[in-house]
Amino acid sequence: MRGALQAVALWGRKAPPHSITAIMITDDQQTIVTGSQEGQLCLWSLSPELKISAKELLFGHSASVTCLARARDFSKQPYVVSAAENGEMCMWNVSSGQCVEKTSLPYRHTAICYYHCSFRMTGEGWLLCCGEYQDVLVLDAGTLAVLHTFTSLQSPDWMKCMCIVHSVRIQEDSLLVVSITGELKVWDLSSSINSIQEKQDVHEKESKFLDSFNCQTIRFCPYTERLLLVVFSKCWKIYDYCDFSLLWTEVSRDGQFFAGGEVLAAHRILVWTEDGHSYIYQLLNRWAQMGATLRTFSGLSKCVCPADGGVLKGTVYPHLLCSTSVEENKSLHFVMGYMNERKEPFYKVLFSGEVSGRITLWHIPDVPISKFDGSPREIPITTTWTLQDNFDKHQMVSQSITDHFSGSRDEVGMTATITSSEYIPNLDKLICGCEDGTIFITKALNAAKAGLLEGDSLLKDSPCHTLLRGHHQSVTSLLYPHNLASKLDQSWMVSGDRGSYVILWDIFTEEILHTFFLEAGPVTRLLMSPENLKRSDGQILCCVCGDHSVALLHLEGRRCLLRARKHLFPVRMIRWHPVENFLIVGCTDDSVYIWEIETGTLERHETGERARIILNCGDDAQLIRSEPTLSVASETHKHKSIEQKSSNSHQPGPVPCPSVQLESSCKVADASSVPRPFNVLPVKTKWSHIGFHVLLFDLENLVELLLPTPLSDVDPSGSFYGGDILRRAKSTVEKKTLTIRRNKASCSSLQTEAQAKPSGDSLVLGDSTSKFSEENNGIKRQKKMKSSKKAHPKPPRKVDASLTIDMAKLFLSCILPWGVDKDLDSLCTRHLSILKLQGPVSLGLASNEDLFSLMLPGWDACSTEMKEYSGVNLCSRKVLDLSSKYTATLLHQTGIPRGLESHCDSVQQSDAIVYLLSRLFLVNKLVNMPLDLACEIDRPFKMETVHSKARFPGSDILNISSFYGHPKNGGNECRAPEADLSLLKLISCWRDQSVQVTEAIQAVLLAEVQQHMKSLRNTPVSSQPDPVAEHSICERMQISAKMEWTEELELQYVGKSSPLKTSVSPVKHGNDLNSANFQDTEDILDRCVLEESESAGQPRHRPWIAKVCSCRMC
């Protein structure tokens, strides 16, 4: 399990499109939530003065959003649920912008209602859903799992709209639903709770045809408990809820189509149309003589009619009071809603969202009245706003990553439209294909710094970039093959365009090596075959085209191997048969085409259950995402799906289909020997355009690369308790075993990262885990390596130290709250060489399941508490309070070196940066820790840890000296002092208080930087010889062990293993394993010594020395 990745959005000057398809206002009336055709949700701040400002974009859906609804009692949990056309459902915390639950169901919802009866049901309540399927689904509001179905006895059909009726008089709840054929159905919710819990059928209690089609809205009048408003496309009707008798019908005029309505008050309704017009009616002559007194009243059963058997003698007559003013644009489609439950100042608000992305608010008066002559009064627009308004007002901070490169500008001077993008981590190169066919290559880190930081005038004036010209149409796809095929040339790059041309480039010499013409549609995807494909001539390139065809190209041989053109539907998935050399193509209609690569013939075509079995077996699937709604993180998995899926093959157990087993798993990652702490992801907001880029920072990888000792070389078995060197040597095998277990578990979690961590950085990932080999034309597992076999030496990590430090400095520049303390800003710039931001940046988080949340420019425009901090890089006012509390706890800590000299060198700067990053990494881990595991960690707070010898799950985190300082007095045991416990308890309290990860990181960074710079503010410098450099070795090594233990602890939680027993001493473990693997231990020790840097004038890092020696120099 890995924490969330820190993200920084480089928006550019143009806002991403946000075609609104659903809109709602939260119950606290502070946030507007909109769903879009592009699949994103947008959170808009709503001030008490009804001012709007876009706050945050949420990425979680890969299809258009169809409906929104609240998913909890909002006063307790601010949760909103969203549904998409492809069946995806997400539950969002609108306060933090994080997705708390996600599922995918084979249903397309058009309406969702939240229902919870506190005194009759347990759990979080129900989500009642209807849509393009029969009847009504009942979902668990906590897990989004299907609980039951409300079924129809008469005329089952698709349901179009619904509402929940709460009857105060009889204390009963009912569900009213109207089908697409105009049939009204009533279910009793109160009496169905027990039936649903017992899984019994629940049928409707009443039904009635309403003699109209295409119902848009049904609303119950809670003020009279008698009126029922039903809005159809061409008319709206008023019914008596008692017996569903028709009271009035109003037909649309001038070709307008009604889209919805609400009940404003007793006998007053609001109806709106598809083009954004709305009308307020007063219902006159509301009730005539009723005849005999009603003997019964139920919201579910019909009332008793008068004795003569007649119907209601009176009807209602609507009188038009008011209408709303609308900017005339009949080509746009509006989605509208109404909110009349605002707290003080008790506004009644009509709101609308347009396809253009504009939100409009009208303040509805409490008592609408017409003019003196009886004509309707016009209600003016109160507020209107778009995403682009945010960008225009705060354009200074919305720099695109390509704004400073002249090669990306057309003849008019405007920035060229980017249609495809690819980042090469090994070379730190960003490759962008443009609509005019040009491709430019630049240094990604330099481009990001030029767009975000001050003081890079030289870079902005003369940026270093390369232009490639060879395409005559829009470049639609890019691929760097060496990332996926380690045997291919590092200089190769492949691009495809809309004209079905594929060009093989040499990016170093800027030459065209070969041009392929596929004679098909636009090239939409470029994929590499897995390395286990049994071909003597190497790996092949797969091209997916817009006309549903697939082509296979051999890059080294410069020839086309296969053109598959018989697919009737778009290609959804590509699979490879590693033994028989088959290409398996899955289409969106769930059909499968199996092609023989050698001959180019169609082997067979399967549909139905057989096709699903073929698609579901094996682990080498490459998903082809749909272009129009591309989530941010999908680009990460586009090329990495092989290594992520195949990591599951490390797990023991049978494989579903032996014919398509995968031989190797993580070989793809061998092409990159450096972890990816920094990544650049393109976001396609339209089907053919890259809207913006997102910078991703992986704190764990960043800290790992900056440490002098790899994590796998550090003993994670707990602590730096002194002992003798022989025992440390004997326990080396134990360290190896623990690392194996961690890495095997980590393989399955690689998909949670924006970029998978390469296996070259792990000591035993590629050598000691289960391997595969081909025997008798099949693929079987080999057993683990015998202890008698020598382990292959780990290749040295090829890390550009200066590049990694630049990544760390860029991250700190983006996170640091610039502007809070100007003196602190200048000290950071001067002594840490961290450049100041040009303005506040848009921060965000990338979670584990393709879920992103990104702040928008000017997100704090409506925040009253942030007005005094305008222009400050603060994610919230809460950061300052958290930082003060952290500083108060920090002052009681001893043993941790803080403070810089006035003339510090680059080594001291690097050590300070590593220390700051390690702190942020630990805070990120603690705040993101699951609640169950956090409870185990919090348990030692309530016990006497000084005299207790028991080991609790999670209590090891208290004994890691990297977080709390060094072992005191050189003792064998490092106990956390009370001040350190209070620090950990403080961060744990932040998690319980729903503090966001970004807020916690900013607060800790601000407090730590203030402590580091404290010595520079005062003229006298402390004479204590305690510089950072003296402690850097020990401290870094201890940070390594802390990271190891955090991962080990989380893996035990994820794997749901048995509770940890009392830890066994290293002596016993070492003796148990040493009997079989002592020779292997000696090899590792010898190799570790040989691999150490022997440069003159530089100290050689010996992690084991720090464990035996108590002096600070070691």
From Swiss-Prot:
Database matches in Pfam families: WD40, WDR72_alpha-sol
GO biological process terms held by the UniProt record: ameloblast differentiation; amelogenesis; enamel mineralization; endocytosis; extracellular matrix disassembly; extracellular matrix organization; gene expression; microtubule polymerization
Tissue: Expressed in maturation stage ameloblasts (at protein level).
Subcellular location(s) of the protein: Cytoplasmic vesicle
Compositional bias of kind Basic residues: 780-796
UniProt note: phenotype after gene disruption: Viable with no gross morpholgical defects. At 6-7 weeks of age teeth have an opaque, chalky appearance, with reduced enamel thickness at occlusal surfaces. Body weight is reduced, probably due to problems with chewing hard foods. Enamel formation is abnormal from the maturation stage onwards with significantly reduced mineral density and retention of proteinaceous material in the enamel matrix. Tooth enamel hardness is ten times lower than wild type. Attachment of ameloblasts to the enamel layer may be weakened.
Region annotation (Disordered) ranges: 634-658, 749-798
Alphabetic keyword roster: Biomineralization, Cytoplasmic vesicle, Phosphoprotein, Repeat, WD repeat
WD repeats by residue range: 15-54, 60-102, 160-197, 327-373, 413-452, 470-515, 566-605
Repeat among keywords: yes
Record-listed Phosphoserine modification sites: S1093, S1095
A GO cellular-component term linked to this record: endosome
Stored PROSITE patterns: WD_REPEATS_1 (PS00678), WD_REPEATS_2 (PS50082), WD_REPEATS_REGION (PS50294)
Protein name: WD repeat-containing protein 72
Native source organism of the sequence: Mus musculus (Mouse)
